[in-house]
Regions:
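Short, acidic/polar
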Residues: 41-58, 108-125, 180-192, 247-259
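Substrate-binding surface in catalytic domains of secreted glycosidases
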Residues: 129, 133-229
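Aromatic-lined substrate-binding rim segments of carbohydrate-active enzymes
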Residues: 66-102, 142-169
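Active-site groove signature of glycoside hydrolases
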Residues: 62-72, 118-148, 268
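Secretory targeting and sorting signals
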Residues: 2-22
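Aromatic-lined carbohydrate-recognition surfaces of secreted/lumenal glycan-active proteins
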Residues: 36-41, 96-108, 151-186, 232-245
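Substrate-binding cleft of secreted/luminal carbohydrate-active enzymes
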Residues: 196, 201-210, 225, 229-289
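Boundary/entry segment of secreted carbohydrate-active catalytic domains
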Residues: 22-62, 67-69, 103, 243
Length: 289
């Protein structure tokens, strides 16, 4: 136990800048309204960046969330040239772009480097991302205490160095933690809320909650628990999905739960490649935001 504590302290000292304080909250408008998602496995989206951007724009999407890398990627930015062209194509259509990285918390220096890569990335036209986010879902590091320590240290670095760039936390939904209490006991909702500008819960139901009522109940409770945990002053963007694993009724249930919650400012389905006409139709009543 003593060695574990010392390791946790050492990790904090390595990762957190001395004297770093949480920066003032940035404008979270980038996370509002209709969004869609592109991950590192969506190579077809990059093959014709202009055509993909046009399709996204035709759906009224305000923000595209793009994964720059995860802890298993072979590069700090996956396919940087193609990504840059795609981001420029989106921005040419006045679509905002938020980058996200999935840290593993096993190699802190790797996570720091790849987090910083989001901030330093520039497109061929010189554009930066409009926002950045950490995808907090890896459970590879079995020590929950050390995982929490490293999450907070990484988030402090991101908050400190992001400046005016808005920062979001992408997380398992609160209901997911409630159903699986061993995943991440005592998740640091309060501490993280001081370090981010918005929360993005992955309220994915897929085939696990069949039917309208089950889907609605899971999403509604997830949003209600999250709002209780993080307070009323921080925006929430609800991400549902996976889109092609949901029926029309389940897609409607997600949208209805988001609308009924009353304080959610953004919404999306994961991901663009799997969202068909039924998915876009379900989101339509929420509007572009």
């Amino acid at each position: 136990m003593r060695r574990l504590v010392l390791a946790a302290v050492a990790a904090t000292l390595v990762l957190a800048p001395i004297g770093a304080q949480a920066a003032p909250r940035a404008d979270a408008e980038v996370f509002a309204g209709l969004g869609t998602w592109i991950d590192v496995y969506d190579a077809p989206a990059y093959s014709r960046p202009g055509a993909t951007a046009a399709k996204i724009a035709a759906r009224g999407v305000r923000t595209v969330y793009v994964e720059t890398a995860n802890d298993r990627s072979t590069a700090d930015i996956v396919k940087p040239t193609q990504l840059g062209l795609f981001v420029d194509a989106l921005k040419d259509r006045d679509i905002r772009v938020v980058a996200w990285y999935l840290p593993g918390f096993v190699k802190p220096s790797l996570d720091v480097r790849r987090t910083r890569a989001m901030l330093s990335f520039r497109t061929p036209k010189g554009a930066a991302f409009d926002g950045v986010a950490l995808d907090i879902e890896s459970l590879s590091l079995k020590s929950v205490g050390l995982r929490t320590t490293r999450l907070l240290a990484l988030s402090r670095i991101l908050r400190s160095e992001a400046g005016e760039t808005p920062v979001a936390a992408i997380t398992y939904p609160s209901r997911g933690f409630e159903r699986h209490p061993t995943w991440w006991p005592s998740f640091p909702w309060t501490e993280m809320t001081t370090l981010v500008d918005a929360w993005i819960p992955m309220t994915y139901t897929g085939t696990s909650f069949p039917g309208y009522d089950a889907t609605y109940g899971y999403v509604a409770r997830s949003l209600r628990l999250l709002r209780t945990a993080v307070g009323t002053d921080i925006p929430i963007h609800a991400a549902g999905g996976v889109a092609n694993r949901m029926t029309a009724d389940e897609l409607k249930a997600f949208a209805d739960a988001v609308a009924d919650e009353g304080t959610v400012t953004g919404w999306s389905l994961y991901d663009f490649q799997t969202t068909g006409p039924k998915g876009w139709a379900a989101l339509a009543p929420l509007g572009p935001g």
